[in-house]
Design a protein with these regions (language model features):
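A structural "hinge/loop" feature
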Residues: 1-9, 29-30, 57, 111-124, ...
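N-terminal lobe/hinge region of extracytoplasmic solute-binding protein
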Residues: 1-38, 69, 151
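Aromatic- and charge-enriched surface segment that lines or borders ligand/interaction sites
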Residues: 32-78, 95, 101, 110-111, ...
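Surface-exposed binding/hinge segments that line
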Residues: 46, 82-135, 157, 273-276
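Ligand-site clamp/hinge motif
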Residues: 48, 144, 174-225, 360-366, ...
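Extracellular/periplasmic solute-recognition and catalytic clefts
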Residues: 71, 91-94, 159-169, 191-256, ...
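Structural transition elements
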Residues: 156, 272, 288-333, 351-360
Length: 400
């Protein structure tokens, strides 16, 4: 199963800790505490008692030790988090059934947050030693419904998966309920549907065939709510949505000419009108980010400390054009820059099923074209979008 696949992190694989974006606190879950020494190079983890895997085996320090050592031994660095663990961890030591000490190669104040706390989609997945100990981690699929695989510590188990839906059923013997840590979740069955484009999601939600959905426009939300009063947003009034922790961006491949020239990339940034993107693509449900950092209250001191690096929400097309022309490009009769017989172009890839990213891409294309760059926007499938980003198969991509 994919570590980021639909529902696995929410239902099956529980984290040690969870970052609460509203309070800026790191809350404990399977982990009871993870504290550092004064030098920040020795971290001590204490696991909550009574945690069990879904097959009844106890979750202990042995599972943590086994997982970390597996990642440290991965010479290919192809396993999730193996490169990070090899960068930071010198060794791990078991100190009792529920305690592990991490000895780091150098101080890391973010060790707990970066690797053992859920921030968005998930965190490091801890492996059950009693199943994985005699398996080859590079080939073992960990999927066999007859054996109940995959297992986790979560309150649900995977019961079926297909191209269009993933189904989980509640485990009434979940450790959290048995130990009194948390009550059983209300839903007895959770279904993740692959809905495709926004129109499909909106129709399903309006007909009460979806209980939760994401990535829809303001117009679509208001239409759904007019048809189905049970649909609510995070906030009762504009801007309705909770601010995502990842500001959106246009990533430009700096290995492809002429965009390998930082002055040319700076020109793009100057030409982009971020305020217009918010108005058109987001229908004023967001605001331009000043930096690459999300503007949560806890981040304010850091953002205020770099005011000299704040990004202007309005465009400066003339300054952008000056940078382009200083690199030898001349505006042609068709309105686009040319040099040595070639037009200045930029192809922008977007996620076909992500209406938000597509709309942002559309606005950027028009802004760049108006300034003399022959920009195009190509919507591709999510799997291709992810692969192209990972392997640099793009000129530019709207992402985060």
């Amino acid at each position: 199963p994919s570590p980021t696949g639909p529902g696995m992190n929410q239902c099956v694989w529980e984290p040690l800790f969870i970052l609460n974006y509203e309070t800026a606190e790191i809350e404990s879950w399977i982990g009871e505490s993870l504290t550092a020494n004064q030098a920040l190079d020795v971290w001590t983890l204490t696991i909550r008692p009574d945690v069990e895997w879904s097959d009844g085996e106890p979750f202990t320090a042995d599972d943590i030790i086994f997982t970390i050592n597996t990642l440290l031994a991965d010479d290919t660095q192809s396993l999730g988090d193996s490169a990070s663990m090899q960068q930071w961890v010198k060794r791990v030591e078991k100190v009792g059934l529920l305690k592990v000490i991490f000895y780091l190669k150098s101080p890391n104040p973010r060790f707990k947050l970066d690797y053992f706390s859920v921030r968005v989609g998930g965190s490091m997945i801890i492996l059950p030693e009693h199943i994985w100990s005699d398996k080859d981690p590079s080939t073992f699929k960990f999927y066999d419904p007859k054996k109940g695989w995959p297992i986790g510590t979560g309150a649900y188990r995977l019961v079926s998966t297909s191209m269009n839906e993933v189904v989980f059923d509640r485990r009434d013997d979940w450790w959290g309920a048995k130990s009194g840590f948390q009550p059983l979740p209300e839903p007895k069955r959770l279904i993740w549907l692959i809905t495709g484009v926004e129109e499909n999601r909106a129709l399903l939600a309006a007909n009460s065939e979806l209980d939760s959905l994401t990535d829809i426009t303001l117009c679509a939300f208001e239409s759904i709510r007019a048809q189905n009063s049970n649909i609510v947003a995070w906030k009762d009034e504009m801007p309705y949505a909770w601010l995502d922790p990842c500001p959106r961006q246009l990533s430009v491949n700096h290995t492809i000419p002429p965009w390998d020239n930082p002055k040319m990339r700076k020109a793009i940034s100057l030409i982009i009108d971020r305020q217009q993107i918010v108005k058109i693509a987001y229908e004023d449900t967001s605001f331009p980010s000043k930096t690459i950092l999300v503007e949560y209250p806890a981040m304010k001191p850091y953002i205020d400390a770099i005011q000299d690096l704040w990004i202007d929400p309005k465009s400066n097309v003339s300054a952008g054009r000056q940078l382009i022309e200083a690199e030898g490009w001349q505006l042609g009769s068709n309105g686009y820059y040319q040099k040595s017989g070639e037009e200045l172009s930029l192809n922008i890839q977007t996620h076909a099923a992500a209406i938000e990213l597509r709309r942002v891409g559309d606005v950027i294309v028009e802004q760049l074209r108006s300034a003399g760059i022959l920009a195009t926007n190509r919507a591709i499938t999510g799997a291709t979008w992810q692969e192209n980003k990972a392997f640099g198969k793009f000129e530019a991509v709207v992402d985060w």
